[in-house]
Amino acid sequence: MRVLSKSLAAMVAAATLVGGGAFAVAGTAYAADNDAITVTPNPWYANSFDGWGTSLAWFANATGSLGEESAITTNLGDDASKAKAVEYGKQLREQFYQSIFGDEGLDLNMARYNVGGGNASDVAYGYPFMRQGAAVPGTWKDDATGSGTYGNGVTTKQADKDKLAAAFDPTDDNQYDFSKSAAQDWWIERGATGDNPDITDVEAFANSAPWFLTNSGYATGGRNSGSNNLANPEKFAQYMAKNVEHLESLGANVDTVEPFNESETSYWGTPGDMASKYTDESDDNTKLINNYWDKYYSDKDRSVTPYSNALKKPQEGMHVSNAQQQQTITALAEALKDNDDTIIAATDATNSADFVKSYNQYPQAIKDLIGQYNVHAYSDSNQMQSRDIAQADGKKLSMSEVDGSWQSGSYNPYGFDNALGMMSKISSNVTRLQSKDFTFWQVVEDLYNMQMGSNVNPAGENTNWGTVLIDFDCTVAGMDGKLYSERRVNNNGGTTDGLEPCTVIANAKYNGVKAITHFIHAGDKVIANNDEDNNMTATSDDGKTQTVIHRNSGTSDQTFVIDLSKYGEIADNAYGELYLTTETSAEDKNAGVDSATPEVFAKTSNVKQAEGSVMIDKAAKTATVTVPARSIASIQLTGVTGYAKDAAVETGDTYQLVGKQSGKAVADTTSGDSALSLANVASDAENAKKQTWTFTQIEQPTDSERPDLKAYVITNAEGKVLVSKDGTNALSNETVGAAKSDPAAKWILNTSDGSTYQLLNAATKTNLDVDNSGTTVGTKVGLWQSPSGTSPSANQTWTLRNVTPTSQKTVNVQTAVNEKAVLPVEVTLYYTWGEGKATVANWDTSKVDVAKEGAYEATATATDVYGNEFNVTATVYVGALTVSDPVSATVLAGTSASEAKAALEAAPVYLHVKASPAFEGDAAKVTWNFDGLDTKLADAKAGDNIAVTGTYQLDDATTIALKGAIYVTAATPENVADTASNLTVTNQQTEYSKGDQWKKLTDGDTSAEAWVTWNSAGDYSASPTATIDFGSECELSSVTITYGDKAPASAKAEYTTDGETWMQFGSDVKPAAGQTVTFKADKGTVNATKMRIVNTVNNDYMNATEIQAFVTPVQGAAKNIAAASGTNFSVNFQEGASASKAIDGDTTSKGWSTWASTASTVDPVATFTFDEAQTITEVKTFFYYDGRASWPKSQTLEYQDEAGEWHGVGTKDGWKIQAGDAGSGSDGITAADTPTVDFVLGTPVKAKAIRLTNTLQDTKVYINVAEIQVFAQDSTVLTPQPASDATLGDLRLDGETVEGFDPSKTDYTVDLPVDAEANPVLQAFATDNAAAVKVTGDAVENGKLGGKAAITVTSADESETKTYTVTFNAFTLASLKVIGPTKTEYAIGDKLDTAGLKVTAVYQSGDKTKEVPVALDDPQLAIGSFDSTTAGKKAITVSYRGVTATFNVTVKANAVAPGPEEQKPGNTNKPGATGNGNKNTVANTGSSVAAIAGAVALLAAAAGALFMLRKRA
């Protein structure tokens, strides 16, 4: 194929620049990859991060003495093996340390030192009276004999509690014995001291005060666990201060001291039984006590030693009342007044709800003494309220403790669910709390306790807490010179035979944590993103490295896209590195649980992937990676820096606040007691003024605890400051400068997605809030606290719309030659949030020449509703329209010809001036030829399309041909799943009032738990099933189910037509937690009367949040609307709240009952009213048998018409009723006699309401109704499904259809003209306007010559894809052939004579060569100059389109004159004269003139290239 005319692509490109870029064309958009997961970080919204920590309780106390001879309690070998065991312990301890704080381990950098309380000297304080390792010693000095430490013979025994409490002087060094804490101290000395310590932050905390400073006399809590157990806050505070002093004497700096631990709870109780109770030698508890007593506690008193027979033994802890908390904080501040480096932290509540409760009871003076807020995360609720408090007070918030197991079942260190769950817990909690850190409860757990079950004594918990694991009793030296667990040796008959020595073990959480801690470090900033549950995003301290940690918890690989649009710069050489953390290999798992060491986990931890695994697209502003199923990807980007302007809320900029829930703007219009209310988003200047707010940032000091806080003063258009006042919003006349130090005028921005915000008032710690979640204009905008859930409230969430325009929408205007161009008076401006209208008063068209075809620019100034003036341009195309795009419409099967015609006539017609942008045509000029359409439609079935031709009347003499298509499809499927009428489930949890929770499965909320199959007995069905009964046969197209955080092992969908034979629907799946699974027929739809989703679980429960079933609707089909939205159901009498059960979809269980202790004589009436009148076709009542004939004698149906009048439909009776009185029984009536009363209306009625009056039997027996169904004709307007056509309707080059184009032909080759400089403009249009067209390939790059283009067409329903290719064969200029001019010899001073010069361009394409003469006046031809001032051979260069060649001429020297001659007047300037009158002796070729002429010619050509504008489909 040949292009008949030379390509003018260069001029097309020039015209494109004039027009402002690419132009949208109908049918050229393409769908995004539905399988891609996208995260959008916002680097502007960043919070400083101090690092990763762990409490040292209890593992440090249990392991710090490893490697010391004194720690060995049993030696099974000799002295030599014992010495080896001591050395083994040292190595084990160091390996253990490195696994936690080493840079190849978890790389933690923070430690919480547990200041012990301890119990009395005669109380057995250790295992099994405490949890293993939990007996953290108090540092007060033991004096069991009363030797004088505390004076007056006071001992440290239980009986002297009160005396000791009185005698104890917490400031006296002599009353302390810090050797007792040596085991835990080892960890501090090893990690937190020296010049470059691993542990950079140390916090001292206590679980309990010393036993004698408690009310109960025990460090394990009160006898009443909910009562205050702190007896002396002042001495306890001083005790804490002294321990801080001790820690700092070791060389550590204690940053914070926290005197409480979950002290608000009632967790901490001392057992009521004493060890002396257990005397039965056959009792396992007695055996356990005796195993340890003689060896360790022979000097203790069983009668004062509490013992618990529970699996979990006691630990230190105390409930502290709020009043005692305040006294402790006050006393601690006094005790620390000389320590400038240590601040008080509080309250270490178990969750944010408890923290907020305690905080709200503190007076301001107490709050001022607290330097840091600490909170645990054992619940995610109320975390945003904790965050708000810390932000408003300008203090750091520490997430100071959490752990858990995300692995179901018993001990399984390899279970990767634990890694995935831990990653999500970290990312979501750090982001939501904006905490300075993430600190584990204890990142280590006692291996024995995690691993062992109930079949041994002592039993273990057999679960999966902790991250690193080690036995907490490695005190037995084996004959092999290794250490062993004392419990394991005891269980093994006192030998080590067959036992594994003490080893550092890990579980899968170890890798899940490392996937984050090895990439996000102290000093980095955690940044917001749109999916905090699955992504943690951060930027390095220097801003040069961007980190994204992403988990794929699904069962298939993900295409993971990082949206970089909110970053400021993407360097040309930007690159990314990908590290993957995956499940341990089957081979390593098969080695057994004792082989689950950190070294084994390292094999699949942070494995660096090949270069190029992260694909950065600078133009698209994306980074893309493939993340395998069930893995964690750690991605680091280099060369991506800063933040984009639209990612930030810039100081001095003006914004609209548009509500997420309401879609309306905040206006400074009073409503109630607030100065603010909702208003429709302004479309005029007057209203816009009331909705614009200027944000002025309050800069935070560099030494601030919250340097990254996004705090602002907000002013309205009049300059008034938005403030909180009396619990609501007001406008103040204070200055912005004054407002910056006014908490009431300080607004703090929070975001959960990096794009929408909540506005927190610092004074009230409440958010800008739409009253009662209203959405109507005038609704008050007040203040309210953040919600207790994990997501911000929609009525507190705002889009901040910067009202400064950024660019304009392209304006293209077409006019015929010599006709005045009509330019718009309104244009569209783009903003960071979207688009808005602006008015134009006058266009400058001085550069538009309507007398000549071409593309011209017009300019104007546009003014938007916010008062901004913005310079805009329009491109005016002068010339006639030449070609049209395909036109299509899609209609339902069965549509009449008139309706089909109307659909096509309503479709827009787009036309072009050759390759110009598209212009919508005038519908009045369109004529379609519908001959034979009636017949074609009658024969058409769903999936067919009908071709139609037409014309566009350009003028009286000219028409443009139109090609149209009418697609015939079935109706778009609708979701019919409804728990009120057709959906039922099995195995729903009934405990904790969750029996009806499954009914939320069709409420549209995919986030809230609905169907859950848990039960306390752990008796789980293998196949929890959800079934939908459609009531009649229908066309089923798809079914979806969204799972919660517990997905089944597998799931399948089935359907039936007869209720007995079930057939597979789609494929079996193995869903992941949180996944939405869609089941589809292999092709099209299936006929079904019922469908079901069958889930298989492996001895575990599952949960789901939403189910949908899509069927092809039938116009006017009857549908049960009894429980539908818009239907209101009421009864005149009911037992309790039973009426609602009459419309719950259950026709077999008891529902509405009118039983009463005193029989009612009122006839029961059920009424249904409808928000909109309904066409009723049937009303059906299912009565219920409860052992007697509890139903009416008759039932009457009435309806209310649209005018409000009631009409009777009929009365039904004739079923069996009682013969005697109401209490006489059923008179032989059985359940089989239960009536179902069915009113089928032969002629449907239009009703605003219906009512059923039940006439009581003569016995006045109550009635029981199982279900009432009300059927109405479905008023849903059916819409056709998208078509499945993926063919091209037209393929054009430079505005002309490609020669030989046929929709069925997919490959085209174009031989370009020899002298083409660029490819012609390629445009592709689908036959179906709703299909997506995407053009790719090097051939469509601007200025490209040759190459290949691929055109991918995706059908509107995305079921079909078709690819076309266009290959451009191009000749390239290889060389020039030059034949020199006729004149080859010149005298000095002569000019070049080009007569006879011939230049030939030599083009090549493969093995083909073509020669084309070049005219000497070609503006691209340049002929060089030569120096004619000296004699000799001269080379002259000829260049053409970047290729050069030379030819030679000779300059001869002037002949020597024989002697002086008389000079004749007037000849001094002739050539060859020796006089200096010839000032220009260098030959000029005119090349500079040619260059100027060439530039002028190009500009002129560009101006005339209206038909060559490049537009890519």
Swiss-Prot record:
Reactions catalysed according to its record? Hydrolysis of (1->6)-beta-D-galactosidic linkages in arabinogalactan proteins and (1->3):(1->6)-beta-galactans to yield (1->6)-beta-galactobiose as the final product
Q: How does activity depend on pH?
A: Optimum pH is 4.5 with beta-1,6-Gal3 as substrate.
InterPro entries linked: 6GAL/EXGAL, Big_4, Cadherin-like_b_sandwich, FA58C, Galactose-bd-like_sf, Glycoside_hydrolase_SF, Ig-like_bact, Ricin_B-like_lectins
Top-tier EC class: hydrolase
According to its UniProt record, the EC number is 3.2.1.213
User: Where would you find the membrane-spanning parts of this chain?
Assistant: 1489-1509
Q: How does activity depend on temperature?
A: Optimum temperature is 40 degrees Celsius with beta-1,6-Gal3 as substrate.
GO molecular function (one): hydrolase activity, hydrolyzing O-glycosyl compounds
Give residue spans, biased composition: Polar residues.
1465-1480
Q: Which Gene3D superfamilies match?
A: 2.60.40.3630, 2.80.10.50, Galactose-binding domain-like (2.60.120.260), Glycosidases (3.20.20.80)
- What residue stretch is flagged as signal peptide? 1-31
Q: Outline the segment boundaries, as ranges, of region: Disordered.
A: 1456-1480
Q: Where is the F5/8 type C domain?
A: 965-1112, 1116-1273
Annotated function? Involved in the type II arabinogalactan (AG) side chains degradation. Specifically releases the non-reducing terminal beta-1,6-galactobiose (beta-1,6-Gal2) from both dearabinosylated larch AG and polymeric beta-1,6-galactan chains by an exo-mode of action. Shows lower activity with larch AG, and very weak activity with dearabinosylated gum arabic, gum arabic and potato galactan. Can probably release beta-1,6-Gal2 from the internal side chains of type II AG.
Listed name of the protein: Exo-beta-1,6-galactobiohydrolase
| Organism of origin | Bifidobacterium longum subsp. longum (strain ATCC 15707 / DSM 20219 / JCM 1217 / NCTC 11818 / E194b)
What lineage does the source organism belong to? Bacteria, Bacillati, Actinomycetota, Actinomycetes, Bifidobacteriales
The gene designation is: bl1,6Gal
